[in-house]
Amino acid sequence: MLEEHYYSRKTCGSGGGLSVQRTGYPQTDPPVFKAVNSFERAPLIVGDHVHSLPYWSRKITLECTPYPFTLRWEGGVHKDGIPDKVPHPSCDPGSELVSYTHSREVDCERFIGPVPSSFTDPKVTSAQWKFLEDMADMKALADLNKSLVNLPMLYKERRETLKMVGNRLGGLVRVAHAAQDRDLKRYFKARRKDRRKVAEEVANGHLELIFGWLPLIGELEGAIEYAELPDLDFIRCHGLHTLVLQSTPWDNSVDVRSYPNWERAAGTRITGSVRTRGVVESRASVRTALRFNLETSLAGDARRLGFEPISTTYDMIPLSFVVGWFSNFDKYVRTLAPLIGVTFETGSRNRRTTCELVGSTRFYPRTVSPPSGWFARWKDFPDGSLSEVSGLRRTDIRSVLSTLPDPDVRFHADVGLFEISAGISLLAQRYLKPLQRLLKRKSFFYGRT
């Protein structure tokens, strides 16, 4: 693999605006923060989502975005201790000391430390790839069912768009003819010496009318472009499933005895520490994309009104959605409907492994040590400088599907915040019964004495 090793740095201004990335930074010193940025692909890189070709690609990036701050300390020396050839600032003639203020800009990029060992390509077993492929295939097949149900709505929307364009154009024509007839009669009714003034008013009125039409003209232009689209002759569907493999914390601390070039400030030495914290997360995912040709304008009479009997019956079962929290059976039900009016053309399956690094670095100053005979003290003691670190290792391998994948039921736990909230609300409705227990009101029946 061809990899270029260099510093990848982003410098941001004080306003937080445009960021500039510099590459090819000279490596005069041994690199502490070693950034890798490479991208390569296989010879076959063509993929137009219609005739998918197999390809693989790899991308590695590691960047640091520093937000520097300024250290300020105050130092001084007795007048007698200053050599004659050393210039010093002007001071009060009656003072015994010469004081000055030094400031240095701090950048944490140099002390970020080595890249964590966990920032590598994740290892995925064959069983995990098989699980991801089955889940992605099932989602793609279920997405096909949804597309077929929504197909009549697309045709209806196109017909309504054409009707809207005709009505708007007819209204514009009627308004233009009415304005033309009204202004023409007004011009001939005016006296000859006033016709020039009337013509100017008519011209200004027409300009106002035209400028008032500009938003409407733009709307009609977009509607006409939509109506001119080619006829729908295919349907695309896709499914994606992701699996988090590992999440490793990253904690690195480096002691700084003296920042580079700070010794120039009259031999003053600054000590501190740099600490980097972050998380390295590894993920694996599979994306299945399928393309079907449409043989009829409407794929099946049952879907003419946006209705599919098998999926609708399953959705009418109480709490049927809970099954989708622990398996893909809800997607499997939607694949049982027969494929009427469509034929499978091509498809692809993309395997992706991702290792993402996110962290931040702070510099904490400790002491400022002046040379012998001098004194120094902090003037502004900052709380630390922040630098953001981000890294990404991503590998893609795509293969072609010549046959339609078969649905396979898999069990998995896919419970997030949304599912937990829904479960709590279901328990509250079942056991708390707020309308009866909170209000404690008995049911009222007519005829009761």
Swiss-Prot record:
Give its localization.
Virion
Result, substituting R349Q: Associated with poor plaque morphology
| GO CC aspect terms | virion component
Keyword Cell membrane carried by entry: no
Pfam families, alphabetized: Phage_mat-A (PF03863)
Keyword list, A-Z: Host-virus interaction, Viral attachment to host cell, Viral attachment to host cell pilus, Virion, Virus entry into host cell
Q: Where is this site: Essential for infectivity?
A: S360
Which GO terms of type biological process are on file?
Answer: virion attachment to host cell pilus
Subunit details: Interacts with the host pilus.
Give the family per the record. Answer: Belongs to the Leviviricetes maturation protein family.
Q: What does this protein do?
A: The maturation protein is required for the typical attachment of the phage to the side of the bacterial F-pili. Binds to sequences located toward each end of the genome, hence circularizing it. The RNA genome-maturation protein A complex is released from the capsid upon host receptor binding. Maturation protein A enters the cell along with the viral RNA.
Record's protein name: Maturation protein A
The lineage, from the top, is: Viruses, Riboviria, Orthornavirae, Lenarviricota, Leviviricetes
